[in-house]
């Protein structure tokens, strides 16, 4: 849905000063009109290059069989190294609040916490982050129950780690009749948890949940290949991540909590009806 898209990109525009992750890739009428055949070929030849690709095949195949097909179908190309260059991105957010009016049945919000992104997270950091977020905001968490009991969210509420080259953020969001109140409750809950640490029982529930989801995803051949690619692009390995989840300790999670979710470095994005206050 376009409104979901808009609330997220407004948040990214409020968080990031320079990083291109904030740019709406759908473009505008003006930018699309500027596209030429020469530009398309330039982009194609730079990025759709065998030296800039990873091939992953999952299923009832052999290495020799895959290589035979690849050698037949893939066009040889000039060997080149692709490097990305990004402007320096400060740690601090650009704007704490972004709002847009749009014809929606209920206001939407994204609360994004900007994280350090000097280098990609490794398997242990990813595992600890996923367990931490599950303990904080899954539908079995105290935060989720408090938000629901206060009628500040509904079942659309979600959370995610949004990470890539040069950017990293944690996002909470969904539909809310009072987005600012929901955001304040989330920030206050995080502040309280930072003082006391994650409860051991909550940690165990979250660790088992993340581990179970990770293992069950291996039932899907397409999920396996997608996961291998996703992790490989960041220099990681899916099975090392699963092992890290299985071996995670409570102190690892609390250590990760201390490193992230700075309540003074977050952006609230809201999309609401024009006549709503």
Predicted feature locations:
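His/Glu-based metal-binding/catalytic segments typifying zinc-dependent metallopeptidases
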Residues: 13, 82-142, 146
């Amino acid at each position: 849905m376009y409104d979901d898209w808009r609330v997220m990109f407004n948040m990214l525009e409020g968080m990031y000063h320079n990083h291109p992750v904030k740019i709406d890739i759908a473009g505008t009428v003006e930018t699309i009109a500027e596209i030429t055949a020469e530009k398309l070929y330039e982009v194609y030849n730079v990025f759709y290059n065998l030296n800039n690709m990873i091939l992953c095949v999952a299923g009832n195949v052999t290495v020799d069989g895959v290589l035979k097909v690849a050698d037949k179908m893939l066009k040889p190309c000039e060997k080149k190294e692709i490097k990305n260059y990004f402007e320096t991105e400060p740690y601090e957010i650009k704007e704490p609040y972004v709002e847009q009016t749009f014809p929606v049945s209920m206001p939407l919000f994204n609360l994004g916490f900007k994280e350090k992104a000097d280098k990609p997270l490794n398997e242990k950091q990813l595992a600890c982050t996923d367990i931490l977020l599950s303990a904080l905001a899954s539908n079995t968490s105290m935060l989720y129950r408090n938000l629901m009991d206060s009628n500040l969210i509904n079942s659309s509420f979600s959370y995610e780690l949004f990470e890539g080259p040069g950017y990293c953020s944690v996002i909470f969001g969904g539909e809310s009749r009072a987005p600012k109140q929901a955001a304040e409750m989330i920030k206050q809950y995080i502040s309280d948890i930072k003082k006391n640490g994650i409860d051991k029982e909550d940690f165990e529930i979250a660790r088992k949940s993340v581990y179970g989801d990770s293992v069950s995803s291996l039932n899907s051949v397409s999920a396996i290949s997608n996961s291998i690619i996703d992790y490989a692009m960041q220099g990681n390995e899916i099975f090392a991540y699963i092992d890290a989840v299985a071996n995670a300790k409570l102190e690892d999670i609390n250590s990760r909590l201390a490193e992230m979710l700075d309540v003074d470095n977050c952006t609230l994005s809201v999309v609401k009806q024009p006549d709503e206050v």
